[in-house]
Amino acid sequence: ISQTKPLDPNVQPLEVQVVSMDWKWLFLYPEQGIATVNEFAAPVDRPIRFKLTATSTMAAFYVPDLAGMIYAMPGMETQLNAVINKEGTYKGLNSHYSGAGFSGMTFKFHGLSNEGFDAWVQQAKTEGKVLDRASYLELVKPSERHPVTRFSSVQDGLYNRVLNMCVEEGKMCMHHMMAIDAAGGAAYMKKVGLNLPDDVCSVENADRVVALLDQRDSQGAVAQQ
């Protein structure tokens, strides 16, 4: 961060969702609707808000010219705020040992003008690849020195499924499991006519549990008004 150039409080930070994989980095841009592997970019002087998680092994996200190191961990989200004040191409890496492909787990960060960033986004949108749950499950398989890859669109809610470890069909998300516990666990499930754990192990029953929890939450919100 520049010592002489204060941040403009009226500028909306650029959100970048970061997923550490074996052994590559996935970057998702919810505002722009794109995603990239082993490459990301941001406009100069625009604050960046990183949200980070991991798929299996803890890693450490580090761009020495941008900001300090921060860990990315499975089932958890960490956050980092940063800004780049000078155009250029910078090296990013995993600074925490994470297995066989650790040494090649690097990426490029491009600090661009506003026009250059818009052009970079448009280039990604022309790649024609779609990042949905199926293509994500292929991407997440371990690979070393993965080439830069760009996705023109991203399935809604994908990052939240990654964070809650439920990208696979039929797998209940962590936040739904926690909601069940908060509602009373097995006693609550029996009250609404479901038995744990067997009834939650199918796609249909998992969806039913979530629907019941959503209904309970909406009723509670109405009661509080």
Model features per residue range: what roles?
Residues 1-225:
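Non-transmembrane, membrane-proximal soluble domains of secreted or membrane proteins
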